[in-house]
Amino acid sequence: MPVSPAIPELHARIVAALTQARHDAKLRQVDLAKRLGWQQAYVSRYETGERMLAVDEYVAVTRALGVDPVALLAQVLDGEDGGVD
């Protein structure tokens, strides 16, 4: 789903990278939510741009995905395509 135009571009790129990382990990939203102790709707809301993630939530999501939070953010800031190696 496209990210809402109401959220800033940087946040949209971060969300795209997180969503791609989830897909790369072959996890459904419900699987990620379970790892985090969240409801699936919460994952959906941040992935669609309905809700912004706080920094601590971003770190929790990256760790649940097995992705380094600093490396992912560096890729986004460096203008990478949002994918995770």
Where are these regions (language model features)?
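Key DNA-contact positions within bacterial/archaeal DNA-binding proteins
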Residues: V30, A41, R51, V70
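A short, Lys/Arg-rich alpha-helix, primarily the initiator
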Residues: M1-D24
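Short basic helix-loop element that most often maps to the first helix and adjoining turn
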Residues: A16-R35, A60
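Short, basic-rich loop-to-helix N-cap that marks the start of a DNA-contacting helix
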Residues: E50-R63
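Short, charged recognition helix plus adjacent turn
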Residues: P2, R63, A71-D85
